[in-house]
Amino acid sequence: MEKITVLEKGQKLECSFEDLLKYHGVGYPGGVAHAFQVMQRAFPLLDDGKLLERREIELVTAFPGPGGRDAFEMVTRCVTDGQIHVDKDLPEAAGSPHGRYYFRFSYRGKTVVVTIRPGFVRQDFIEMARKPNRTEEEEVILAQMKRDMAKRLLDAKPEEVYDAMIL
């Protein structure tokens, strides 16, 4: 089972996708999966593969989803510490239901930008998620789409899903 490992005051903390999902709940598994994979993609690039002190990680993102926010919070405490900044108008990146899949992490003077590659987020999902006044049947379909996206993301390596650029 893959895990994200960070430090808190020098002590190792490990979080699996399942841990993050337990913290978040069942509402947005796709968002939790995005955050999990994005952190796996970005963190090794922020300090040459060394473990990061979690409370020193800052995130600027165009992705406002609650699944992602909860996953980032559990690993980095960025919500509690005011180290996450959501700006839906950030540079071009693939659209999400209510923002964009753009993540800019900073750590001790180094910055990495992570964006999703085409093909992992289906247009029918975005359309369904944005649809106002969904029926109960559509809510069931959307919930399945979220689970399917989480599986699609987790079945791939982070490098296959996301581009990363060191600034």
Enumerate the language-model features and the residues they cover:
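Non-transmembrane, aqueous-exposed alpha-helical and coiled segments at domain scale
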Residues: 1-28, 32-167
